[in-house]
Amino acid sequence: GFLAENADFASIVQAHGLVFIGPEPEHIRQMGDKVQAKITAAKAGLPLVPGSPGAVDTIEEAQKLAVDIGFPLLVKAASGGGGRGMKVANSAVELSEAFSSARSEAKAAFGDDKVYLERYLDNPRHIEVQVIADSHGNAVHLGERECSVQRRHQKLFEEAPSPAITQTQRKNIGQIAANATLEMGYLGVGTMEFLFQDDEFFFIEMNTRLQVEHPITEAITGIDLVREQICIAAGQSLPFKQENIQFEGHAIECRINAEHPETFAPTPGIVNFFHPSGGAGIRVDTVLYSGYRIPPYYDSLIAKLIVHGRDRQHALARLRLALQEFVIEPIPTTLE
């Protein structure tokens, strides 16, 4: 929810003598500001996309930095998320419009018009690493997730493990993420997001909460991330070490949104008939039922279909069958 990454809320919870199930407020605040997150990430040894050292206040400053960084450039909101406040500039002429547009969009969406610059990678993979740490000096990674299939910079399909990286790359980036988590003194579950292009990883942000796509990590590791974050908040140690974690099979998540399948326009309304998929290796997380009214507010995500197979081909076969079985009527959805 909206409070999961709200540092002020976490602080209020702690001030009232309660335990916030999640990271410390300082880490939520650091990683919520994308500029501060890059500074923290650099100190923790994470590889970064070439870009501005901090927030850029004027177009004149942006033009000067662009000479060193090179085009194409991405102008990004410091407090952004969900693909909002991001504009691509392919030249100095386009930069002026992108800079102004990104700031306006950021101000309207997040109440903060701070932006920064990054080199725009034209064909990257979006790969994220699940990390988890306790208050006893233990931090591990639970492998990576491939999240490259997106629309409007928002994910549609996720899978684990990624078919795009090697075992050596997987081990290296996982260890880098775990070491950075320990270096930061981070507590609880978190996700480090990277862009991967030309065999290089570049850190872009850290989500200080449980991700929508966490079930595919649970499927291939057998670890209940919800349970573990509650146990960590209760002061317990992680019940496993890095060497104990085994990855089994392949998992894919399909986000089912109340959106028109071609235009992605929202489609709120009443669900007259709902039939979720079932069977071996199939999991459905949803609030839907026959008669449920999909509201016109918030996110359009209404269900998550997760499949687990012995390998990628097996998982894809299960996904095809599960999608055929899944019925939501009469609302148009991305199932179609």
Residue spans for each PLM region:
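N-terminal beta-alpha lobe that positions the nucleotide/phosphoryl donor
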Residues: 1-192, 196-211
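Acyl/amide activation-and-transfer machinery of modular secondary-metabolite enzymes
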Residues: 152-159, 295-304
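Active-site "cap" helix and flanking loop/linker of ATP-utilizing ligase/carboxylase catalytic domains
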Residues: 159, 165-199, 207-261, 331
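A short, well-structured catalytic beta-strand-centered motif of the EAL phosphodiesterase domain
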Residues: 206, 210, 303-307, 319
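A short N-terminal helical cap/helix-turn-helix that marks the beginning
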Residues: 232, 321-336
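Glycine-rich active-site loop/lid that clamps phosphate-bearing ligands
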Residues: 243-298
